[in-house]
Swiss-Prot record:
Name of the protein in its database record: Prefoldin subunit 1
Superkingdom in the source lineage: Eukaryota
Organism in which the protein naturally occurs: Homo sapiens (Human)
Source organism phylogeny: Eukaryota, Metazoa, Chordata, Craniata, Vertebrata
Positions of modified residues (N-acetylalanine): 2
Family (UniProt): Belongs to the prefoldin subunit beta family.
InterPro entries in the cross-refs: PFD_beta-like, Prefoldin
Alphabetical list of Pfam families matching this protein: Prefoldin_2
Amino acid sequence: MAAPVDLELKKAFTELQAKVIDTQQKVKLADIQIEQLNRTKKHAHLTDTEIMTLVDETNMYEGVGRMFILQSKEAIHSQLLEKQKIAEEKIKELEQKKSYLERSVKEAEDNIREMLMARRAQ
């Protein structure tokens, strides 16, 4: 009778271990993406503050591939604001994904603890 219980617990532990490793990798990836998006957001903000100090009639060029396109100050300003907004939205999504992954691992650990407590009670 003890052998099936041991096999069941062993299987549950191996599944938990695989899930924890997979989740840790996904959380690390999300952290890296969040850091990169924060850098992008900061870069866009700093560029925008520099641009806003210039006179409205200043010629500005946007780099596209290997060429530069003449743009108005307002067009570049709106592009930078949009870039910041998109980065903030993606950061929020990644943080939600990260918290979901951490919750799912905790729930799996709690389920195994409950299974162990039930086995000890028998």
